[in-house]
UniProtKB/Swiss-Prot annotation:
Transmembrane segments: none annotated. Belongs to the protein-tyrosine phosphatase family. Non-receptor class myotubularin subfamily. Coiled coil: none annotated. Residues 196-639 form the Myotubularin phosphatase domain. This is Myotubularin-related protein 11. Pfam families: 3-PAP, Myotub-related.
Length: 709
């Protein structure tokens, strides 16, 4: 490492091997006492967190500049403004904190035009005067150094960030870091949301949904059926576990059909992987498969989940384009920005997901039937559509508790590969499907603000939590991996270890925590902002509660099977794809669906249902969102958070936000007082009195005339 004047170069040594946590600091020569981290800085670290380097006297941003200290630890990069009061209750959610895994790009800047990427092993031609930290959550941290970057500590903190970021893809390095309040109290901590890790959790949820024709299966308790499935799931009462084991072997990755949600009117929403067509099932296996798919209903609708929805590669490409467009340093001209936004295809994919979820919601709520979501892997789009269908159909899922339970059941417990899809194992299979789902939920929140108990701030907190590696919720791909890491399973075999519910000893306490432990990362005042002040429980009808089969549920002919694809229902001669299989379900040629156009939803064309089902009214409690043109909007508070000038003027979603915005406007009005006419000055108004709309309009008009003059 050497230093010189402007124009000289420095080299960032490549990482030769993955060191243990904190070894970056331990392997260096001890710094002089004056350069050791102060006790004040060290006291602000989380248990297990170590300061690698820091640089005081840096400045953040351009206008207005904010001076402070840039700190790099083995967990995050944080900027601490001068005089900033650190809050022990909120150690991880500062707007100045960037988890290492959240850093998407690190750039060095010198002058006005010299910009280079910083990565291990790269040779740079100049000393950085500034560094740009691009967050994968659409945030940007711009930090300038004193003396044009010639201070040794500026170079040290830059080196530390580059090296620490290179090591951040190793999830095990966070195993010794715990949240500051995680160890408070004695005994095990009760999860705020059922984690769906025990048979009791599944039985409680089954009773809550009144799914009387279903039971909790323990066939996968040792994860010997499928490691990506939860230990427990719901299967029909009359199916034995031995039949479940054989039937699941004929589906991709062993993910056979199981209940996702039971509608109060009687319909069942199932999900499964693709048929394993290379298998050779016998007659008993085919019978078990069809009984599980039929779920005791005379009408069965098989939904091709991947039809008309983007592929994983499409989702990843659209997200990369969106992130590049929304960053402050985007080179797209303002007059072409909307066209560039349309070119990302992100909003098109949001529109496609909402449209298909609306169609499936109509299928589930309009008749008593079995609706099966089928995706080859059953771990991505099935979870997205199943969750959206429940949000559209069940008011309970729109509550704060219900939504968190929904995500835990349909995403976390169901085996969505969070670590892979969020880029934790490399970019080859990265695809932020869960973030696409959160955008869809935000669209629903904008269109139906009185129907959701949670606010936009809650969605933002959940969106940002996927980039904070403080719990195992988003650090593992399957329930088996989470159980193995937390000591519930043997590390090398899929053998069940009794007593897994007991919290592990030592520093691994946080392994039992989940993303839903908001009180460990947020203050009570911040958690209050998760509530939507416009939520009206009375707005949600009570007719969705369990009751006998309603009049709008009209059963069809016996044993009818349909394929829902491209907005139309097509009859199937048999349910299983195996050649010459003695299918128990066959459709009669006289029950043919009416022609449907793929570009229109079922709700827009009387649902496109077969004529024998008759005309049915929309069931109460069902939300049918709009998805045409301007009805689908950009989530500006999330994607444009790196542009403060765009954030100004956004509507405040909470009462406290409205109060802050009102205080800001009153402060502006007090500053504009000299522009008010003499007649207004003679009134001797109290500066804290709220002006009425007429007076505000007069002030703004006077300001505008003064600016024009």
């Amino acid at each position: 490492m050497w230093w010189g004047g402007r124009g000289q170069s420095f080299n960032i040594a490549p990482q030769k091997e993955e060191p243990e946590m904190g070894s970056v600091q331990e392997n260096r020569m001890p710094e002089p006492r004056s350069r050791q981290p102060s006790s004040c800085l060290a006291s602000r670290c989380l248990p297990g967190e170590q300061i690698l380097a820091w640089a005081p006297g840096v400045r953040k941003g351009l206008e207005p500049e904010l001076s402070g200290t840039l700190i790099c630890t083995n967990f995050r990069v944080t900027f601490q403004p001068c005089g900033w009061q650190w809050n022990q209750d909120t150690p991880l959610n500062s707007e100045y904190d960037f988890a290492l895994v959240n850093i998407g790009r690190l750039e060095a800047v010198s002058g006005l035009s010299r910009v280079q990427l910083l990565r291990p092993g790269s040779l740079h031609k100049f000393i950085p005067e500034e560094i740009l930290i691009h967050g994968r959550d659409f945030r940007l941290l711009r930090v300038g150094f004193e003396a044009g970057g010639l201070e040794p500590q500026a170079f040290q903190v830059t080196m530390a960030i580059v090296q620490a970021r290179a090591q951040s893809n190793q999830a095990q390095q966070y195993s010794g870091i715990t949240l500051s309040k995680a160890g408070q109290g004695s005994g095990s901590r009760k999860p705020p949301i059922p984690l769906m890790e025990t048979a009791e959790d599944w039985e409680t949820e089954r009773k809550k949904q009144a799914a009387r024709g279903w039971r909790v299966s323990t066939v996968n308790e040792r994860f010997d059926v499928a490691t990506s499935l939860p230990r427990y799931f719901w299967v029909p009462n009359r199916i034995l576990d031995s039949e479940v084991r054989r039937a699941f072997g004929h589906f991709h990755q062993g993910r056979g059909p199981r209940l996702s949600w039971h509608h109060p009117g009687g319909s069942d929403l199932l999900r499964c992987g693709g048929f394993y067509t290379a298998s050779d099932p016998n007659k008993e296996d085919i019978r078990a498969v069809e009984l599980m798919l039929q779920a005791g209903h005379s009408d069965v609708v098989l939904v091709d989940t991947m039809d008309e929805l983007p592929s994983l590669a499409d989702v990843q490409l659209a997200h990369l384009r969106l992130r590049a467009l929304c960053l402050p340093d985007s080179s797209v001209a303002e007059d072409k920005w909307l066209s560039a936004l349309e070119g990302t295809r992100w909003l098109d994919y949001v529109r496609a997901c909402l449209r298909k979820a609306s169609d499936i919601s109509v299928l589930v709520t309009s008749r008593v039937r079995s609706v099966i979501l089928q995706e080859r892997g059953d771990r991505d789009l099935n979870g997205l559509l199943s969750s959206l269908v429940q949000l559209l159909s069940a008011p309970e899922a729109r509550t704060l508790f219900g939504f968190q339970s929904l995500v835990q059941r349909e995403w976390v417990a169901a085996g969505h590969p969070f670590l892979t899809r969020l880029g934790g194992t490399g970019a080859s299979e990265e695809a932020p499907v869960f973030l696409l789902f959160l955008d869809c939920v935000w669209q629903l929140l904008q269109q139906f603000p009185a129907d959701f108990e949670f606010s936009e701030f809650f969605l933002l907190a959940l969106h940002d939590s996927v980039r904070v590696p403080d719990t195992l919720t988003f650090l593992r791909n399957t329930p088996w991996e989470r159980g193995k890491q937390s000591g519930q399973l043997n590390s090398y075999t899929q053998v069940y270890t009794p007593g897994y519910s007991q919290p592990p000893a030592g520093n691994s306490f946080n392994l039992q925590l989940s993303v839903w432990d908001w009180d460990l990362r947020y203050s009570n005042a911040q958690i209050l902002q998760f509530q939507n002040p416009g939520y009206d429980p009375e707005h949600c009808p009570d007719s969705w509660l369990p009751r006998p089969q309603p009049s709008f549920m009209v059963p069809g002919p016996p044993s009818s099977v349909w394929l829902f694809s491209r907005g139309a229902l097509t009859p199937l001669n048999q349910l299983c794809p195996w050649r010459d299989s003695p299918s128990l379900l066959a459709v009669s040629s006289r029950w043919l669906p009416r022609p449907a156009i793929s570009s229109e939803s079922l709700a827009d064309q009387e649902w496109g249902l077969p004529s024998h089902w008759g005309a049915c009214p929309l069931p109460p409690g069902l939300l049918l969102p709009g998805y045409l043109g301007p009805q689908i909007r950009l989530w500006r508070r999330c994607y444009l958070r790196g542009r403060p000038e765009v954030q100004m003027g956004l509507s405040a979603p909470t009462i406290s936000g409205l109060q802050d915005e009102l205080s800001h406007l009153q402060e502006l009005l007090r500053k504009w007082t000299p522009r008010i006419s003499p007649e207004d000055h003679s009134k001797k108004r109290d500066p804290h009195t709220i002006l009425n709309p007429t007076e505000i309009a007069g002030i703004l008009k006077g300001r505008a005339e003064g600016d024009l003059g």
